[in-house]
Design a protein with these regions (language model features):
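Short gly/ser-rich loop at a beta-strand->alpha-helix junction or flexible surface loop bordering the NTP-binding
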Residues: 1-117
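Surface segments flanking catalytic/ligand-binding clefts of nucleic-acid enzymes
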Residues: 94-190
Length: 190
């Protein structure tokens, strides 16, 4: 916010914009702060600041900062990170009902042509799920996908307690296997 006050002409893209939207952003993506400065003499990267000439297609005022539009924010985040680091941000946008997965895929098709990382971004959009309850669950699901394992068939599944009729257990991830067995994945406790 301080940078936005000092430089009102700057536009914040990618994970920096996602943070302003209140989306889940992995800690490792908080730095460097990303900035679009169309008048910047060149693309500059440092440990704390990443300035590019990227021209935002859609700019919104979020709080007191200019940020890229939500679709561009999510696309830039997904282009800029592996699936497991992009999924928390995308999942939270879906969870908060800010956008649909179909709109994201359509935007990626239209705006992502020939962009570096577009295949990875499309994969993140295709696997995004607003049922994820926190960024940790999203990251674990992303790692499972990146490693080539079958993604969960259901998130936040409710299972009956066989010993206590009427009581249910809720699990973070559920895999329903072809042979009828189920595998449960729990990220943050029981």
């Amino acid at each position: 916010k301080t940078l936005a006050e000092l430089h009102p002409e700057w536009v914040f893209p990618s994970f920096s914009a996602a943070l302003m939207y209140g989306l889940w952003v992995p800690y490792s993506r908080l730095n460097p702060i990303r900035i679009c400065a169309p008048n910047a003499p060149y693309r500059r990267r440092s440990k704390h600041l990443w300035v590019s000439r990227l021209t935002p297609t859609d700019v919104h005022l979020e709080g007191e900062a200019n940020v890229t539009g939500l679709c561009q924010t999510l696309l830039e985040s997904a282009l800029d990170a592996p699936v497991h680091l992009a999924l928390p941000t995308i999942d939270s946008a879906l969870r908060y009902l800010l956008i649909s997965r179909e709109d994201l895929l359509e935007y990626a098709q239209r705006e992502g042509y020939r962009r570096r990382g577009i295949g990875r971004a499309r994969a993140a959009f295709a696997h995004a799920d607003g049922e994820s309850e926190n960024g940790g669950e999203s990251m674990v699901r992303g790692i499972i996908i990146e490693l080539g394992f079958m993604p969960p068939t259901m998130l936040q599944a409710e299972l009956p307690d066989p010993l206590n009729q009427g009581h249910v257990y809720r699990v973070d991830m559920l895999w329903e296997l072809d042979d009828g067995r189920c595998v449960i994945g729990e990220v943050d406790g029981a």
